[in-house]
């Protein structure tokens, strides 16, 4: 397959070619690691991404306009946390979380009657939270993380011509301690391990999660209507809440 064909297939799996909104919902856990310490399951994690595609005439691919919200949960009860070790929890409110896709050889693996698209995204860039300004909240002046995605779809669905195909996903993320955890430069960090599904509509998001979003940021039920920059992240959102 050409890079253009691979991107076309991936776009149908990740979103919808007709510009209709798609919602991915995921659930999982967040584990800590640190030298000399056992691995610990600190949080449950649940979230969603509402997205829509539009053609990127300039780049010859697509622009994905999206928002994503995600929540840290009590690992036992799976209730959304408001505090952790007497510190306020800052949940994920990334608006926007846009992507620009240009044709590239998207890794594709046939797994029986399924097709898997894999994305490995190493990140390293100047931290929005310099240690000098945020000594309790920042692990380093360089933000480093690793995002690992797998999107699965039935091969038979992909062989058709529908603009969107059913999909499930897995996501693993290795990152520094979260800013609100106030771990400073302590060695170690977090591993997120989640699985998810493309929903038929936002109405399929668990009711308690929809209620939480509706009471705080109802706009996260929909994808953005227009392209904006820059993207929001947990680090930039924390800086916005806590300017220095």
Question: Predicted segment positions?
Answer:
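Intrinsic disorder/low-complexity segments enriched in polar/charged and small flexible residues
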Residues: 27-28, 35, 86, 95, ...
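Predominantly extracellular/secreted and cell-surface proteins with exposed
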Residues: 34-162
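Intrinsic structural disorder/low-complexity segments
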Residues: 32-34, 44, 90, 176, ...
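Short, low-complexity intrinsically disordered segments
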Residues: 23-24, 31, 82, 91, ...
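N-terminal segment immediately downstream of the Sec signal-peptide cleavage site
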Residues: 1-72, 207-244
């Amino acid at each position: 397959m050409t890079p253009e064909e691979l991107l076309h297939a991936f776009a149908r799996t990740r979103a919808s070619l007709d510009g209709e909104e798609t919602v991915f919902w995921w659930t999982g856990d967040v584990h800590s690691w640190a030298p000399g310490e056992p691995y610990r399951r600190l949080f449950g994690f649940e979230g969603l991404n509402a997205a829509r595609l539009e053609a990127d005439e300039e780049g010859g691919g697509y622009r994905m306009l999206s928002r994503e919200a995600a929540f840290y949960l009590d690992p036992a009860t799976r209730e959304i946390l408001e505090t952790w070790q007497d510190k306020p929890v800052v949940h994920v409110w990334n608006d926007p979380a846009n992507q620009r896709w240009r044709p590239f050889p998207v890794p594709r693996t046939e797994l029986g009657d399924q097709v898997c698209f894999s994305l490995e995204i190493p990140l390293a860039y100047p931290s929005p939270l310099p240690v000098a300004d945020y000594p309790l909240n920042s692990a380093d002046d360089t933000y480093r993380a690793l995002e690992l995605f797998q999107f699965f779809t039935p091969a038979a669905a992909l062989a058709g011509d529908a603009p969107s195909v059913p999909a499930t996903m897995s996501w693993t993320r290795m990152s520094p301690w979260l800013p609100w955890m106030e771990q400073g430069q302590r060695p170690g960090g977090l591993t997120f391990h989640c699985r998810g599904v493309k929903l038929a509509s936002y109405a399929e998001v668990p009711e308690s999660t929809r209620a939480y979003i509706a009471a705080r940021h109802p706009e996260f039920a929909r994808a953005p209507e227009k392209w904006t920059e820059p993207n929001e992240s947990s680090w930039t959102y924390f800086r916005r809440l806590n300017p220095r």
